[in-house]
Amino acid sequence: MKRNRFFNTSAAIAISIALNTFFCSMQTIAAEPEETYLDFRKETIYFLFLDRFSDGDPSNNAGFNSATYDPNNLKKYTGGDLRGLINKLPYLKSLGVTSIWITPPIDNVNNTDAAGNTGYHGYWGRDYFRIDEHFGNLDDFKELTSLMHSPDYNMKLVLDYAPNHSNANDENEFGALYRDGVFITDYPTNVAANTGWYHHNGGVTNWNDFFQVKNHNLFNLSDLNQSNTDVYQYLLDGSKFWIDAGVDAIRIDAIKHMDKSFIQKWTSDIYDYSKSIGREGFFFFGEWFGASANTTTGVDGNAIDYANTSGSALLDFGFRDTLERVLVGRSGNTMKTLNSYLIKRQTVFTSDDWQVVFMDNHDMARIGTALRSNATTFGPGNNETGGSQSEAFAQKRIDLGLVATMTVRGIPAIYYGTEHYAANFTSNSFGQVGSDPYNREKMPGFDTESEAFSIIKTLGDLRKSSPAIQNGTYTELWVNDDILVFERRSGNDIVIVALNRGEANTINVKNIAVPNGVYPSLIGNNSVSVANKRTTLTLMQNEAVVIRSQSDDAENPTVQSINFTCNNGYTISGQSVYIIGNIPQLGGWDLTKAVKISPTQYPQWSASLELPSDLNVEWKCVKRNETNPTANVEWQSGANNQFNSNDTQTTNGSF
């Protein structure tokens, strides 16, 4: 018997409704097997650099060129490998993370560039069908995924994949590309401007021109032409190669620099392939540097459309930027700013609980650096003054940021070393303090005693079991410049979170839906006493409190978040899937007022709506033209779907 499949609207995984002629001609639909559904909202992701994490096999350190290795030079390979990661799986299990995102393990260029840099990071690929010799071999990779999938670990592996480009076009290997060791082409040889393997349009000179951003070289990296059928097949087959080796999800590098129609087609084909081998629910999330709920115009304004319709979620850089400004205490950025962003992202992202939220990453200085330094340049787009705080104070602020990251709507990603408060104050060649490569330092250690480690473990465990944290509603309960108290809720599962970046303060909070009682905080030593839906809460500076209730006696909400899913929603060009029903929120059976939903994992479409409590609902799935409501109409057959909003959080229909 098939398990019922469900992604809520809060999913940012979407697929094209209007694919271009080439992509339509290539689409195939796989037969649906018995499969196990994967919902990544239950996951806590840990992002690590393979080369920087742990050296488990010193024999591969030099690779094919000893000049590429120097354990004391962060521009070069420093020794980390797959064997080292295998050896440290017990550590990661104890940390409570459930998914490991690794930098691309594919074969990279074998030489240093003119500035002495190497491909240790994995983003200068030359062969998408081989593992780089510095990291081990395919047997090592399969051993890693087999162990991760075993009952001892029950972890997922996220592959960082770079379909936008290969390697530099003007030095080193000049864009050379191979398939399992067989040479295909390089940038100088393949000179057809827009019909060959590469675009030959030069580098991006106008970052406000979206065509350039997508079709010119990103700096000097050879820009792949994904509309070429051979290129598409190479990238698709490369993805399947890694899925066959055990990959569970893909982080798409530089999604901003590729056409949406390619992303839609590729993610759809990979999703179908994953289903065909019995692994439904393959997850994608992309790197769009500058993606933010606050940015709705210009090139970066397109990020919201990609998040809602491309087939891939995004890393929420807007959340990261807002959180850093609030924690550092930059002028005008308060807990009210953070609360406003959390509310806004629910309105612009169709699927905000599927976007990936994070505090640290590899492209700008770590939060610990920004908190402690008085510099003004920390990385691309991050030219604001640091906090000049003490190490101890900075660590408390990092703890606060971790609690926020782990409890807001979205899938949390923790950058390696954050659990040890990693920070670096070295300036790179661009004058950026603590940025590339100094935010990619060797793993500082593997002890398990820090408060940050404890927070990640505790809240990671909470995420595994709590529907409220996985996909529940977000409601602000109390906020001022320094304190934010909010509720996450799904049915009778309620989590209350309080964050204080200011001086010690006592506040009175009302509208707390949990039953009367005393609730110990899941982190720290505080507790919350609730009586008649109110509490008086004392918070120390930089303190966080997290409580949970699962009582059937919880105060009934005035609204319920209901997740609608329509399965088997195959569409033609210009057609989308809608939900329609007997209540005003569903259009009152008026096709012109039906609610358009998102293709969460095509051909599955989902939406999340807030409806009044104790409401009897009848509804159906319907396909119709996006601009002409009476064209291309196809109704779900059979009886209406029915439910009462007090009785369920999920409801499903199918064509």
From Swiss-Prot:
GO biological process: carbohydrate metabolic process
Cofactors: Ca(2+)
Domain of life: Bacteria
Reactions listed under catalytic activity: Cyclizes part of a (1->4)-alpha-D-glucan chain by formation of a (1->4)-alpha-D-glucosidic bond
Chain positions recorded as Ca(2+) 2 binding sites: N164, D223, H257
Chain residues that bind Ca(2+) 1: D55, N60, N61, G79, D81
Gene Ontology molecular-function annotations: cyclomaltodextrin glucanotransferase activity; metal ion binding; starch binding
Active site: D253 (nucleophile), E287 (proton donor)
Domain notes: May consist of two protein domains: the one in the N-terminal side cleaves the alpha-1,4-glucosidic bond in starch, and the other in the C-terminal side catalyzes other activities, including the reconstitution of an alpha-1,4-glucosidic linkage for cyclizing the maltooligosaccharide produced.
Subunit structure as annotated in this protein's UniProt entry: Monomer.
Name the record gives this protein: Cyclomaltodextrin glucanotransferase
Organism per entry: Klebsiella oxytoca
Gene: cgt
